Amino acid sequence: MTVHVIYGSDSGRTEAAAGKIAAKLDARLIDVKDATVADFEDCDLLVLGSPTYGEGDLQMDWEAGVDLLAEAELTGKRVALFGLGDQTNYPESFADALGKLYDAVTAKGAEIVGFTDTKGYEFDVSAAVRGGRFVGLVLDQDGQAGKSEKRIASWISQIL
């Protein structure tokens, strides 16, 4: 199975998480600023990741990445999403960027895999929650970094 992990990162935390995920999936790791439309299309499983900045914004390189997604043929493509957020300082927009990626890929007909439970997190609102579950893996490297390895491992077993 061919897997591409495409991520955006400024501080390096999302890049580090993407690297761990890619290593466990034996995947090709791609920074979104270097991605092409083919990178989104030419794989069996597409994994996308972004931190949430400010009041729910995608990482800035994803602005162009979302445009590439709009050009890509994703109908029926299995897509898994992961995101980083800070539930303590941003409880009103916790991991919202994940919801934006979800909207972008589902609009293109992608099949989302890897929904996760919201239990164990404390936040007020998140655009990453649909039907009572997160649309992908959510990591809080600010307040719950010690839980990330277990969360990644559990999520990976779910998306394979």
Which role fits each region the language model picked out?
Residues 1-2, 43:
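Secondary-structure boundary/capping motif
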Residues 2-24:
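N-terminal beta1-alpha1 ligand-phosphate binding loop
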Residues 16, 24, 28, 42-160:
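FMN-binding flavodoxin-like domain, especially the glycine-rich phosphate-binding loop
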Residues 27-37:
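A short beta-strand-loop structural module common to alpha/beta enzyme folds
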